[in-house]
């Protein structure tokens, strides 16, 4: 108070006022503070001070020719004095008004293109429907959400290169546009923005909105896709929510949704193959989502979901350090533990080997419909605070936490044997056995857990074993809260390793993810997912497997044929025949395979019995491990259309029909492609007959000496190579076969291989 009085007295003296208004500020520190750097230090003051002046704006000299000196009201629009320190003119705010009303107009054609994201937002809001407002407590939890709908998924660096190339094509600086999406976008935008008069900087800002995903950590109670987040301020408050249905979808949300579905399908399929990791990688690399390669999407898309993260880990990408159990994402917030193997007995006296976490730890658990804070010690749950959308969701979270706590009373609550298996028919690990058991029925678990009286704490209530709320009693250590638990905010990613069974571990060896954690929820993808891998043929059912298998053989017939005669075992082991096995009755697989392999060997041994159509028809049956038996078959059964259908060994059937006239194959009435047979098959030329017993390796190789005549060949030892002069003076490199059994086939492949070697 004293100080203020003193200042008032000082200000009443005219001398003080004069000093303050006339004296220059010459203290270096102050000058530095307000003038260093381009950042305005006091924007509000600056704005007030500028607008109080008559001509606060500077403009290019050319403006004088374009704007009159005075407007209709006779107010001056620009000053004749130049701006100090530049060759621009000083202009009044009134000049802006005049320009907006009377200035030149330009074509508006580029506006919707540059401000695309805004125009699209208006459309979505116009067609969206807002429902009633409900007043209720909102359980919001902070999640990392996408805040700009309609963006591509380029990294900041990739987008920067595209923007520079589109907006400032003549600027120097190395720009490398490598990814497919970069090139497509650049081409498209250059065409759209030809002769665009909008300020380049503005165009650059708008392009950034279109190309890069922007995320924020926001409290959300409902939908998290970007078309809901853009209206977050309209749909939920502290105590109210308004129903809203978006008036349109955006590609980025569709990509996220389709990516999750593709990843889940791929992980589920990989789990049941002989080498899950190799299969998973093969499928990720051969799958496209909405016409873009899945691996490109995985590299750019930050979606965190169990299956997506397993695919990322397999590709060597970093993922979040949190781990998944029972569909909840766990993040340790404090404490530490060491793991020890321990044997425990269930209520059914079954022995389980579990890895016990010894030590005090605190975790946050975040699921789709419930969240919780868990404090635990060695095999003991100390406290669990849950919040969720409904009774069911809360129960799910409690079960997961109880199992995770590894408490003895939970293990003793097991009734019956634990023998859950995964899709590949392998037993689940003990922790997942327990989880599945109680997810099926948790009555005994809740009854045996024990209850305790509770204190009255604001915002918290108790929950009884039958999952009803109570203010007096609660399950031991468990409370239900009105407040949600925020998702883990950090976007930090860690290096992980993955084993061939798709278990993902951090560098300390903790398991973060495994295929058991992948949701079984089925959904319909918004964008077309194209799985080129043979492993995904079965996703559309048995018929698709049948058609795809035969299409594959026909497409690759040239190489299949050579392998059929020279390295059949390698051919039989091709993964493309794996899906087909599920169509062959289990009991018959081995017998069919043995029969077909014997038949093929006879074809190889007896010249002239090479029957293309029959080889194609029977080849998939030879892929199963063969049983040696003398059985002969005239037809082979496949299970399609809900029953066994027959494929005739000799002749056509509804399943496999080859039309000699059109040379086309139909499988179950669907076209499977055309056969291009060698015209000289069966009447192979003299060279091929003479070269029987030799493998043609390719063009002449000078290291093996001068060319021999065909007659001199007989002196070669088995496995020896030589150049040979054939037919029209061409020279090819051959090797004498090590085995005699395959001699007869050479004449079929020789003609073609000679042709290939010469060309």
Curated annotation (Swiss-Prot):
Assigned protein family: Belongs to the influenza viruses PB2 family.
Coiled-coil residue windows: none
Self-association and partners: Influenza RNA polymerase is composed of three subunits: PB1, PB2 and PA. Interacts (via N-terminus) with PB1 (via C-terminus). Interacts with nucleoprotein NP (via N-terminus).
UniProt motif Nuclear localization signal: location: 736-739
Chain's role: Plays an essential role in transcription initiation and cap-stealing mechanism, in which cellular capped pre-mRNAs are used to generate primers for viral transcription. Recognizes and binds the 7-methylguanosine-containing cap of the target pre-RNA which is subsequently cleaved after 10-13 nucleotides by the viral protein PA. Plays a role in the initiation of the viral genome replication and modulates the activity of the ribonucleoprotein (RNP) complex.
Chief location: virion
One of the protein's GO biological processes: DNA-templated transcription
Organism: Influenza A virus (strain A/Chicken/Hong Kong/YU22/2002 H5N1 genotype Z)
Keywords per UniProt: Cap snatching, Eukaryotic host gene expression shutoff by virus, Eukaryotic host transcription shutoff by virus, Host gene expression shutoff by virus, Host nucleus, Host-virus interaction, Inhibition of host RNA polymerase II by virus, mRNA capping, mRNA processing, Viral transcription, Virion
UniProt site (Avian adaptation): 627
Originating gene: PB2
Protein name in UniProt: Polymerase basic protein 2
Pfam family, one: Flu_PB2_2nd
SUPFAM superfamilies, A to Z: PB2 C-terminal domain-like
GO CC term (a single one): host cell nucleus
Organism lineage string: Viruses, Riboviria, Orthornavirae, Negarnaviricota, Polyploviricotina
Subcellular location: Virion; Host nucleus
Recorded GO MF terms: RNA binding; RNA-directed RNA polymerase activity
């Amino acid at each position: 108070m004293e100080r203020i009085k003193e200042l008032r007295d000082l200000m009443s003296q005219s001398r003080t006022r004069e000093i303050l208004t006339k004296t220059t500020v010459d203290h270096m520190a102050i000058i530095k503070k307000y003038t260093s750097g381009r950042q305005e230090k006091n924007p509000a003051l600056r704005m007030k001070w500028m607008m109080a002046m008559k001509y606060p704006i500077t403009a290019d000299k050319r403006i004088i020719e374009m704007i009159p000196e005075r407007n209709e009201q006779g107010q001056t629009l620009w000053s004749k004095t130049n701006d100090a320190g530049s060759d621009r003119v000083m202009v009044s705010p009134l000049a802006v008004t005049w320009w907006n009303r009377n200035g030149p107009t330009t074509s508006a054609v580029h506006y919707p293109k540059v401000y695309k994201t805004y125009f699209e937002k208006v459309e979505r809001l116009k067609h969206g429907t807002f429902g009633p407002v409900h007043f209720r407590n909102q359980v919001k939890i902070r999640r990392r959400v996408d805040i700009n709908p309609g963006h591509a998924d380029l990294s900041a660096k990739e987008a920067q290169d595209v923007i520079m190339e589109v907006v400032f094509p003549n600027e120097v600086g190395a720009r490398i546009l490598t990814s497919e999406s970069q090139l497509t976008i650049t081409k498209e935008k250059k065409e759209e923005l030809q002769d665009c008069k909008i300020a380049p900087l503005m165009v650059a800002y708008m392009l950034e909105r279109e190309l890069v995903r922007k995320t924020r950590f926001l409290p959300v109670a409902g939908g998290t896709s970007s078309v809901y987040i853009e209206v977050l301020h309209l749909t939920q408050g502290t105590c109210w929510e308004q129903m809203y249905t978006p008036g349109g979808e955006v590609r980025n949300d569709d990509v996220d949704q389709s990516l999750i579905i593709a990843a889940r399908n791929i992980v589920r399929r990989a789990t049941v193959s002989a080498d899950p990791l190799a299969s998973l990688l093969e499928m990720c690399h051969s799958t496209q989502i909405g016409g873009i390669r899945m691996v490109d999407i995985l590299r750019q898309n930050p979606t965190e979901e169990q299956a997506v993260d397993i695919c990322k880990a397999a590709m060597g990408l970093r993922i979040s350090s949190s781990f998944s159990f029972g569909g909840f994402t766990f993040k340790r917030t404090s404490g530490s533990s060491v793991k020890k193997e321990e044997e425990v007995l269930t209520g059914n006296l079954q022995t389980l080997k579990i890895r016990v976490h010894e030590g005090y730890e605190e975790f946050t658990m975040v699921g789709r419909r419930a969240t919780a804070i868990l404090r635990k010690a060695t095999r003991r749950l100390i406290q669990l605070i849950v919040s969720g959308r409904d009774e069911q969701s809360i129960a799910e979270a409690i079960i997961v936490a109880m199992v995770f706590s590894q408490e003895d009373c939970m293990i003793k609550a097991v009734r019956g044997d634990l023998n859950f298996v995964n899709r590949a028919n392998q037993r689940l690990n003990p922790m997942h056995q327990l989880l599945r058991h109680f997810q099926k029925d948790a009555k005994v678990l809740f009854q045996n857990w024990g209850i305790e009286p509770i204190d009255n704490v604001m915002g918290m209530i108790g929950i009884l074993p039958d999952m009803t709320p109570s203010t007096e009693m609660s399950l031991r250590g468990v409370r239900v809260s009105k407040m949600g638990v925020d998702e883990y905010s950090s976007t930090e990613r860690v290096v992980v390793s993955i084993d061939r069974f798709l278990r993902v571990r951090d560098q300390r060896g903790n398991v973060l993810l495994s295929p058991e954690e992948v949701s079984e929820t089925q959904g319909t993808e918004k964008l077309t997912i194209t799985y080129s891998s043979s492993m995904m043929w079965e996703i559309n059912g048995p018929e698709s497997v049948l058609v795809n298998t035969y299409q594959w053989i026909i497409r690759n017939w040239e190489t299949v044929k050579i392998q059929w005669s020279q390295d059949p075992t390698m051919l039989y082991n091709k993964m493309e025949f794996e899906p087909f096995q599920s169509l062959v009755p289990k009991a018959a697989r081995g017998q069919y395979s043995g029969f077909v392999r014997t038949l093929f060997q006879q074809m190889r041994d007896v010249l002239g019995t090479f029957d293309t159509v029959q080889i194609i028809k029977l080849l998939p049956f030879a892929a199963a491990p063969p049983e040696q038996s003398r059985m002969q078959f005239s037809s082979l059964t496949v299970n399609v259309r809900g029953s066994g259908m027959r494929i005739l060994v000799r002749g056509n059937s509804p399943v496999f029909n080859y039309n000699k006239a059109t040379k086309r194959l139909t499988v179950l009435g669907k076209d499977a492609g055309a056969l291009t047979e060698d015209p000289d098959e069966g009447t192979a030329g003299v060279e091929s007959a003479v070269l029987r017993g030799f493998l043609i390796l390719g063009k002449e190789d000078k290291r093996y000496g001068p060319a021999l005549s065909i007659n001199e060949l007989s002196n070669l030892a088995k496995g020896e190579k030589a150049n040979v002069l054939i037919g029209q003076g061409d020279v090819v490199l051959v090797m004498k076969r090590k085995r005699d059994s395959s001699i007869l086939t050479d004449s079929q492949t020789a003609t073609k291989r000679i042709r290939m070697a010469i060309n």
